[in-house]
UniProtKB/Swiss-Prot annotation:
InterPro entries: UPF0358, UPF0358_sf. This is UPF0358 protein BH2626. Belongs to the UPF0358 family. Transmembrane segments: none annotated.
Length: 93
């Protein structure tokens, strides 16, 4: 494979992971904006499942050397901070 093709695959993989992370971030934002039912078990289950799925996607991309481990950690870290904000907001409510 040419260097251009490899770079293209790497960029596409990272863009797809960022897109999936953005969808989860939006779920978190919606819950933060609508804290009508703090600690909704169903919502928490959905977020946990989405986060687990994304972590598996990231792990797979790292193992295929499509993204750097640091890039993957950064994506998860940003979402984990958002989740911490959500949990903090539900405790205050």
């Amino acid at each position: 494979m040419s260097a251009e093709t490899v770079t293209g695959h790497n960029e596409k993989a990272y863009a797809l992971l960022k897109s999936d992370a953005e969808k989860i971030r939006k779920l978190i934002e919606v819950q933060l904006e609508n804290l009508t039912m703090p600690q909704c078990p169903l919502y928490e289950e959905v977020l946990d499942t989405q986060m687990f799925g994304l972590s598996r996607e990231i792990d797979f991309a790292i193992r295929l050397e499509l993204i750097d481990e640091e890039q993957g950690k950064q994506l998860l870290s940003e979402l984990e901070r958002k989740l911490a904000d959500l949990h903090e907001a539900t405790v205050r409510k």
